[in-house]
Amino acid sequence: MTRSVKKGPFIDAHLLKKVEAAVQTKDKKPIKTWSRRSTILPDFIGLTIAVHNGRQHVPVYVTENMVGHKLGEFALTRTFKGHAADKKAKR
């Protein structure tokens, strides 16, 4: 279910402050955040945001195609190592 247009996109206030400061100073240093639930706005384009995945901060370079998505979509939380191999196929 999508969010109501009337409400607008959700973004944490502390992240918005950091982004606005980085845009004003034209700072290219990654912005560290734990807010995976925040929506990517057009102001974020060209910035690198380090999104926490539960273990470490994953750098995410924001492009135009990412606008409207959530930050957490681009920092995967699970690592897939593959299914167990079939013992008969190894012989």
Curated annotation (Swiss-Prot):
GO terms for cellular component: cytoplasm; small ribosomal subunit. Keywords: Ribonucleoprotein, Ribosomal protein, RNA-binding, rRNA-binding. One of its GO terms (biological process) is translation. InterPro entries: Ribosomal_uS19 (IPR002222), Ribosomal_uS19_bac-type (IPR005732), Ribosomal_uS19_CS (IPR020934), Ribosomal_uS19_SF (IPR023575). The keyword Nucleotidyltransferase does not apply. Belongs to the universal ribosomal protein uS19 family. NCBIfam families: rpsS_bact. Protein S19 forms a complex with S13 that binds strongly to the 16S ribosomal RNA. This is Small ribosomal subunit protein uS19. It comes from Ralstonia pickettii (strain 12J).
